[in-house]
Amino acid sequence: MDLKVKVDRSRDVSQPLDKLGPDETLKANSDQLRGTIAQSLADPITLAVDPSDNKLMKFHGIYQQDDRDIRDERRRQKLEAAYSFMARVRLPGGVCSTSQWLKLDELGRAYAGNTLRLTTRQTFQLHRVLKHHLRPALQGLREVVLDTKAACGDDTRGVMATVNPLVSKVHADVYALAKQASEHALHRTGAYREIWYEEERDPSTVKSAPDGSEEPFYGRTYMPRKFKIGFAVPPSNDIDVYAQDLGFIAIVKRGKLAGFNVAIGGGLGRTDQAPKTYPRLASVIGYVGVDKLFQTIDAVMSVQRDYGDRVDRLHARFKYTIDDKGLDWIKAEIERRLGFELAPAALYTFTSNSDPLGWVKGEDGHWHCTLFIQNGRVINHPGQPLMDGLREIARVHKGHFRITPNQNLIIADIAPEDRPAIEEVMKEYGLDAFETRSQLRLNSMACVALPTCGLAMAESERYLPDLISKIEPLLERYGLTDEPITIRMTGCPNGCARPYVAEIALTGRAPGKYNLYLGGGFHGERLNKMYLENVGESAILDALDKVLGHFARERTPGEHFGDFAIRAGYVAEVKEGRYFND
């Protein structure tokens, strides 16, 4: 590849700030993410923060939201919106100790409406935290060595890793590398400590980078947009590695972790009214040994840092940089920065992106139990005090917890002699109810959406369980109750629940209206395609009745629902993301 080919640099970091989007100026002039956040927190007149600080606080893992259920009523009463904040914990690989769980339980009860939310990127979210509770909440996290740094914003977000780290030595090794990757890619500014822990500014952090900033890698303007990293261990693709900006697929040789296939340019966010936006699956470009992992992370991220679009944020993700510049050019530039060529990708096989629920024994003889947590919502339901039950398990459990990328929870590292005690708590609190659920429900996932997400156009978490209850009679009619089919719902097209790789997906368009997609790959290897646009519940159920019935009658042995939807002609196969909207 000829690296001397001229590429368009009119929209990247090489340009003056006044030629770029306003967020670039905001970041550059933010004093390394400090802004006036401290002053906004101290303002007693409003429940909100300054709009500029609201953007900067995302780098601190915090989103300003409001209760949309009462937004119109408060507007009629000429009151400010009911503002609160969501704080997202940085938890690489989803690993959580029992002491950390108990602290999060305490914070959820004190500051977040008696609930916790497990996310699709293996972490916790605390919703409805009031402005004056943010510092106490984040300082509480610090007590158990947790924080919310870089959980949002134009940085690396949370680093994912296939669970369960204790099932095998390879899983443990991959988790350790994912945790190191999270620290390696973390921004270095002291803003977080100063604002949330109220520490004095450390003079040693100033001018540690060539541009005089505190960020040797990121500089003053950080990344063009979010950048997601994930580690998958075949045959499980639970992290949806093809949906990551940078994915590492573990390659095992003679029972040991040898290295990783490198996949770049995944990302599922899109906008319905902007056809230039589309989901894209990551492209596998080669293989690196474990010893080259962090060098590879730096090389790939630096290409996006330097060449990503900083004019149009709808076009700023790495997937667009790759499609604009060309995959061959991007790969060659990565290799130039590495100083060596990537080896050919090694063979691997994925079989599923779902969670095996129930009990499994690890190589060391210890047990692990995966619990179904519907849509990741940890809360006390009538007849099923889930939050209380998990708190009780945390009190008696001697191992750890693992949050899965499907918003479920693993009680991990249970010694054989301790299993009866765990089973007793599970039975007492109804935590084993997943054993009677349909496979469709067990393979479902929804984003939070209303009432707290400002981007949601329709319900998601609060609606999907009810919709599944109306689909389940169809499954029973056609003998498909035990057939694993992935279904995912989001309240908008941005894709937080990774809907565009599901076999059935619904994305919100307006209250009660959704786009219906079919044909995603069972293990996340293929994008789905729109089947119906902007339809309500009755049309969704009628469509699924037709397709599920056809599937039950004419499927071939071992054929998955998504594969059938394409073979039967309900939707066309999407070969590349750029053709998703065709």
From Swiss-Prot:
Q: Which keywords are on file for this protein? A: 4Fe-4S, Amino-acid biosynthesis, Cysteine biosynthesis, Heme, Iron, Iron-sulfur, Metal-binding, NADP, Oxidoreductase
- Sites where the protein binds siroheme: C496
Record GO biological process? cysteine biosynthetic process; hydrogen sulfide biosynthetic process; sulfate assimilation
The segment annotated Disordered runs over 1-26
- The question of whether Oxidoreductase is a record keyword is answered with yes
Q: How does it assemble?
A: Alpha(8)-beta(8). The alpha component is a flavoprotein, the beta component is a hemoprotein.
Indicate the family of this protein: Belongs to the nitrite and sulfite reductase 4Fe-4S domain family.
**The protein, known as:** Sulfite reductase [NADPH] hemoprotein beta-component
Native organism? Afipia carboxidovorans (strain ATCC 49405 / DSM 1227 / KCTC 32145 / OM5)
Q: What is the lineage of its organism?
A: Bacteria, Pseudomonadati, Pseudomonadota, Alphaproteobacteria, Hyphomicrobiales
Task: Write the gene name.
Answer: cysI
